[in-house]
Each structure stands twice: as C-alpha cells, then as structure tokens.
C-alpha cells in the first residue's frame, strides 16, 4: 500500500514516542527525523530503526519535496519560525507545541473541520484528555462553564512543560470553549511529585443547561469508546456524577509504554492524538479517507 512520507522535527521524548507510534501506521512512512544536536539519543534510535536522520533542523525537511506531512515536536518559539517555512514549501504541519498557529485539533471531535488545513495545533495533553468529554456533554446538555484539573506525575513533566505552564492553561481553557463548546473554560495543571509516579488524572467539572443524567452518561460512554480506539489507556475513572446542574467526571490516562513509561499518559495522549490526526490527513491525501460516525461533535 502506498504511504505518505512524513518527517518529525524534534527527537526528544515526544518526538521519539511519536516515531514508534507512526512506525505502526498503514498510511504514513517516516522518511526523516531531524534535530539540532548530532549526538541526540532520539536521532540515534531513529537511525537504529533504519530511518534517515539529520541534525540540520528544518532545513533538512525543506530540502525533501516528497515529504508531505511534518510533525513539529520542538517548542512554541521554534514552531513560530517553522510554520511559515513549511507553508511556503507546501507541507502540512501538525504542531505538538503551544504555538497554536493553526486551528486546534482534537481528532475525535473536529477532524472533519480541519482535514484540509495546512497547519493544525494539537492543543495540550489536558486538552486532548478533556475537550472530548466537554464536547460530548455539550452536545446533549449544553455546557455553560467547563473547568478541568489535570494532575500529572512530576517525573513526566520535562523542562518544556514546566516552562509552558501559562501557555498550557490558556490554550486548554480556550480549546474547552472553541472545540468543546463551553461558554467559558478554565484549566488548572498540578504536577504531583508522588512516588511511585501517579497516572495522569483529569477532573472535569461542567455546568449544564439540561442536566439529563441518562443522556449525559450515554454521550460520555460513547466518547470514551471512540477515544480508546487510538488511546487504549484512556478510561473513565468516575462516570458522570450529576448534582443539580453540575456534572463531575474523572478520566485516567495510562501510557502505552512505546518509549515513555506508562505513568506518562499525558505525553502519550498527545503523541497518540497527533498520530491519529496525521494518519487521517494522510488518508485524505491518498484518497481513502471516509468519515466515521461523523467525526465531529460540534
């Protein structure tokens, strides 16, 4: 089967975990992994798997006309520089940084709206874990306000996450509104230093217009099943608890352990969502994409 050639920029934890996921894809071929440090462990791993590598950064990607999709797993500032260069080169950018140059992408909610975009942003780990639940509740109950608390193992939060705490909360809150449909969104992140490290937990509070418990639970259960198609470790820890017009739901995410440890579910859900988005976009380029169940809850 023909595959779409793709590149990964950024051979760190996120980029390396993403690489392992994309190696299983039926529609994407990783043609290149690039970084800026010749001795990078991620580049060495890629080479050991037979993937071409370069330490010349984005320049190496721009020189390859056959590469159609580029996953940017660097940081917000580099992506702001990369985005216009990739656009000019006619390449699709899937942005795993907080830069948010393109529209927010939560595959299970709004893939069809942005399938032909040349740059999409994967929001945040908290966004990928919670926006679908808010969208599901909003569809049947009307969400006036959504507040999420993402608790992550401190060990899973590298320097990039720690430097981007403000961007995390702002981007996640905005995505709760723009993609999830909430009238107002708020996000809080907690880095938990407990040993052994905790799994990623997300508590989702919503205030709704129509607190129909049966409809809300049905919508959430269906959404969880759909997310599990690409994030097997995603599970409903506490099913929707309806108290008046307040609905509380708790989600746990366990990582697949492709490269990162299972407790790093926050990173795993980002790479899983990016791989899912990339694969669906590749299917469109190959002319084989067919919407399933109307991949939009908006």
Swiss-Prot record:
Reactions the enzyme catalyzes: acetaldehyde + NAD(+) + CoA = acetyl-CoA + NADH + H(+)
Top-rank EC class of the record's enzyme: oxidoreductase
Keywords assigned by UniProt, alphabetized: Aromatic hydrocarbons catabolism, NAD, Oxidoreductase
GO molecular function: acetaldehyde dehydrogenase (acetylating) activity; NAD binding
SMART domains (UniProt xref): Semialdhyde_dh
EC number: 1.2.1.10
Positions that bind NAD(+): 156-164, 266
Active site: 125 (acyl-thioester intermediate)
GO terms, biological process: catabolic process
Pfam families xrefs: AcetDehyd-dimer (PF09290)
Sequence similarity: Belongs to the acetaldehyde dehydrogenase family.
Protein name: Acetaldehyde dehydrogenase
Organism of this sequence: Pelotomaculum thermopropionicum (strain DSM 13744 / JCM 10971 / SI)
């Amino acid at each position: 089967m023909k595959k779409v050639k793709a590149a990964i920029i950024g051979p760190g934890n996120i980029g390396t975990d993403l690489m392992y996921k994309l190696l299983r894809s039926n529609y994407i071929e990783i043609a290149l992994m690039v970084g800026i440090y010749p001795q990078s462990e991620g580049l060495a791993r890629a080479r050991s798997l037979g993937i071409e590598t370069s330490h010349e950064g984005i320049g190496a990607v721009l020189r390859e006309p056959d590469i159609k999709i580029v996953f940017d797993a660097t940081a917000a500032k580099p992506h702001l520089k990369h985005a216009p260069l990739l656009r000019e080169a006619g390449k699709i950018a899937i942005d795993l940084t907080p830069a948010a140059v393109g529209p927010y992408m939560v595959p299970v909610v709004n893939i069809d709206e942005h399938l032909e975009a040349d740059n999409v942003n994967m929001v945040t780990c908290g966004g990928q874990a919670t926006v679908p639940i808010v969208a599901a509740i909003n569809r049947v109950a009307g969400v006036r306000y959504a507040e999420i608390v993402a608790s992550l193992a401190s060990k899973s939060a590298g320097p990039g996450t720690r430097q981007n705490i403000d961007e995390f909360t702002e981007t996640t809150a905005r995505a709760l509104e723009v993609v999830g449909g909430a009238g107002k969104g708020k996000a809080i992140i907690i880095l938990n230093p407990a040993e052994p490290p905790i799994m990623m937990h997300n508590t989702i509070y919503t205030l709704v217009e129509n607190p129909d418990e049966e409809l809300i639970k049905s919508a959430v259960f269906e959404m969880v099943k759909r997310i599990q198609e690409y994030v097997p470790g995603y599970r409903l820890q506490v099913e929707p608890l309806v108290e008046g017009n307040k609905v509380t739901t708790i989600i746990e995410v366990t990582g697949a352990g492709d490269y990162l440890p299972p407790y790093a579910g926050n990173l795993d859900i980002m790479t899983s969502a990016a791989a899912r988005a990339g694969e669906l976009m590749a299917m469109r380029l190959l002319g084989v994409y067919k919407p399933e169940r109307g991949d939009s809850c908006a």
